[in-house]
Amino acid sequence: MSDKKEIKEIDVASLDSELAAARTLEEGKGDKFIMMASVVAFLMTSFHIYTGFFGLFDYSVQRGVHLGFALTLILLTQPLYKHVFKDKFAGSKAFRAACRTFDMILVILTWVSVWMAQDEVHHRPERLSKTTWMATFAGACLVIIVLECARRTLGYIMPVLALIFIAYALAGPNLPLAIAHRGYSLERICKFLATDLDGLFGTTMSVSATVIFMFVMFGAFLEASGCSDFINDIAISLTGKIKSGPALSAVVASGLMGSINGSAVANVVGTGTFTIPLMKSRGYKPQFAGGVEAVASTGGQILPPVMGSGAFLMVAFTEQKYIAIVIAAVIPALLYYWGCAVAVMSQTEIAHVTLMDPKDIPKSREVMKDGWIYLLIIAVLLYCLLVAQYSPLYSALWATCAVPVVMLFDKKKRFTLKTIPSAMVKSGFSAMSIVIGCACAGIVVGMVSITGIGVIFGDMMIQAAHGLLFPSLLFTAITCIVLGMGLPTTAAYVIAASILAPSLIKLGLAPLTAHLFVFYFACLSAITPPVALAAYAGAGIAKTNPMTTAVEACKLGFAGFMVPFAFCYNPAMMMQGSVGEIISVAISAIIGVAIMSAGFQGWLLWRLNWLERIVFIAGGLLMFIPGTLTDIAGLVIAAALLLVNVKKWEKGPKFIMDKHKAKQEQK
């Protein structure tokens, strides 16, 4: 089977639950259940706007209603008949009707269970903290429905992982001594998950029901306004006149949009449908074009100030101020994109890319004339977050409200009053997969909390690493990548943070450093084979082999794998230290990334042989190791090889002919 034929079989939308929901909404126009789902999504967004302005409800109500809306949306848009016996009974109307009836029963049970759970929490003081049968019933129903909805939207990995942790909680006394615990009954587990702050409605659901949803809504409104087109146009207008312009424009546009929407796969599909064909048309290989888009879109989740939803989860877990997390993430994120940009420029020379036709490059002045209003929207968000230092929830709310107000000045009328309801519906559909991921992660975190497996696992990891930091970091990175292969970034981060981050903190890392390390590798799973969803999406658009695209993405995004280890050993990379230390570390890292990029891509003014590539990579690694001697050694290696390649470059074509002639003479 050829690569081309193989790629045609890739269903890009199926790689991301948000894209699948959007496709369902588009295909199901006129379907009464899809219309019901649209109403539910509108009500969900209205609920969050109301609580954003007038104050949050009691935690059990706020988080319960939030979860109830998401579960209802999934049950309406992802009916059972699409996931069970779909081939055998696909054309049976009776089977479809039975499945729809079953789903509606689950919807009713969802809201009954949410009401029972909040009633238990509300009346618990009167009952002297004792729970009733309602807590057990609510917990059992919610766990079953959450797992089923997760199966329909996220696949089997997330619900199976949650079930493994529940089984661990049940089997405590019967396990080997090293991992044994007191054990809990099924009734106790159900009550805990329904009513405890470490259960389904714990920290993860709290962040989802407040900040994350608000930023999802902001992203939906911004997308509806046409901001993505403006970002694409401005990126091309700034970079289009240089050879590497098409690829660099993808890096810029995808990074900016990915920071807001928080989904690497959705961002690849959103911006990649424009950037990938553009790169291919200029001479880049298809796998390289897909890899660039995947790396740039994935990096959006680590790019301040929004960082997808990661920064807000870190605020909850580390109890650090939002501004502190943003500042700490600046240099690592810039190094990630610097590595990608240098790799793009190297590959441009290797591939003999042609310049864009000047007619296809929009003029910056014209782009800004039409799109300056988008800068006002971003300015409102940045002012609220960084200057006024409003809470992230309030900042996102005001930025969302700024969209329809600012767009009144848009001459093209791309956003009108009629656009608001559709943007609100899109907000609900975009959020549902995040909510279900957070709910499943809440089950895992709850089981970790009551069993103490996080402490047990952490102690085992420290013992296996003999108390050394590097092996512990390596094990944590691998675990995060494996978790992220089948889970959304938020869920992978939450689970890894609850199990692995405490042990890294025990080894001496600051809480913020440990959590940022975990979050980085949870994000990088999107481009890491064998299950690299962002790279697969890019391959689907580029019509090339997904595995070669994933490998190309890893080469392009190598800085993302190096930088987290570097900032664990050198806090100055996270802006923790004197100004001199921060500048020194930043310069060393910039040079180190450039050297390593040359090694990975095999180009520095001239093609590098394998020995030169290995030496360049080694030199770059030395620049990442803290210390003056290692920096000097790295610079000496780089300077020596640079001199060699300058001489090759000066000889030009004659150098190639001489080498070819020498080979022929040897033969």
Q: Which residues fall in each region the model found?
A:
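Core transmembrane alpha-helical segments of multi-pass membrane transporters/permeases
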Residues: 148, 153, 163-178, 186-190, ...
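Transmembrane alpha-helix interface/packing and boundary motifs in multi-pass membrane proteins
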Residues: 219-223, 254-263, 295-301, 386, ...
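Hydrophobic mid-bilayer segments of alpha-helices in multi-pass membrane transport proteins
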Residues: 37-41, 62-78, 101-111, 136-145, ...
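Conserved, well-structured core domains of diverse proteins
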Residues: 1-130, 136-140
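Hydrophobic transmembrane alpha-helices that form the pore/transport pathway of multi-pass ion
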Residues: 232-300, 310, 319, 489-521, ...
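Membrane-interfacial loop-to-helix junctions in multi-pass transporters
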Residues: 132-137, 197-211, 237-251, 282-288, ...
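Membrane-water interface regions at transmembrane-helix termini and the short interhelical loops
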Residues: 51-55, 79-95, 123-124, 141-156, ...
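Long, contiguous bundles of hydrophobic transmembrane helices that form the permeation core
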Residues: 2-35, 327-430, 533-621, 648-666
